[in-house]
Amino acid sequence: MSAPPQVLPPRQRILLTAHDLFYRDGVRATGIDRIISESGVAKVTFYRHFPSKNELIEAFLAYRHEQWLSWFSQSLAQYVEQFGDILPALVPCLEEWFSDPHYRGCAFINTAVELADMLPESLDIARRHKQQMAEEIARYLPLGPEREQRAEMLAMLIDGAIVKVQIEQQPQNALLLLREMLNSLAKVWGDQ
C-alpha cells in the first residue's frame, strides 16, 4: 500500500492507513511501527494523536462505521426505490459490497472475534454498529409489532451472508442462498 497523500493532516493519514491495514490484514497482525511507516508520520506525531493502539482501534471502528453505514443507507435506498421493497433490494445491495476486490468481511465481526478478550469495548462498538444496521433496515419495513424483530432477522441473514462470502472467497453461492431465504420470508410475511 502506498502512503496516503502528504497533504492530508497527520491524524487523518494515520487513521486511513490504519483503516486499510486493519481491514486487510487484521488488527492484531498490524503493528504500530508499520502504521507509522506507511502513514509517513513521526512516532511522536502518532502518539500525540493516538496515545494507544486501543484508541486507534476505536477510531478505526468509528470511521469504518460512518463510511459503511453511509454506503449501506444510500445503496439500500437506491435498490428499494428500484424494486419497491426491501427484500428484493438486499441482494443487489450486498452484491455491490461483496464484489469489491478489497472485500474482507465485516470489520466489526472481524474485530470482535480478534479482540473480544483484549478489548471488550470492541464488542460494544460492534453491537452498536449491528443495531444501527438493523435500524436502517427497519426503515423500509411496514410499521407494526413485528417490525423490529423482522429487521433483526434480516440483519442476521446479512451477517450470515457476509461470513459465508468471506469463508468461500466468492459471493455467488451466498447471494443465491440469501435470495432464496428472502423469497421464503416474503411468502411467510405476505401470508400474515
PLM region spans:
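N-terminal intrinsically disordered/low-complexity leader segments
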Residues: M1-P9, G190-Q192
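Helix-turn-helix
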Residues: R13, T17, L21-E55, A59
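Alpha-helical DNA-contacting segments of helix-turn-helix folds
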Residues: I57-R64, W71
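Hydrophobic alpha-helical connector segments
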Residues: A59, S73-D100, A151-L154
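Amphipathic alpha-helical packing segments from all-alpha helical-bundle domains
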Residues: E66-L69, S75, D85-P88, D117-P142, ...
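Secondary-structure edge/capping motif, primarily at the C-terminal ends of alpha-helices
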Residues: Y79, L115, V165-Q169
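Amphipathic alpha-helical segments used for helix-helix packing
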Residues: F98-D124
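Hydrophobic/aromatic-rich alpha-helical bundle segments in the mid-to-C-terminal region
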Residues: E121-R128, L143-Q192
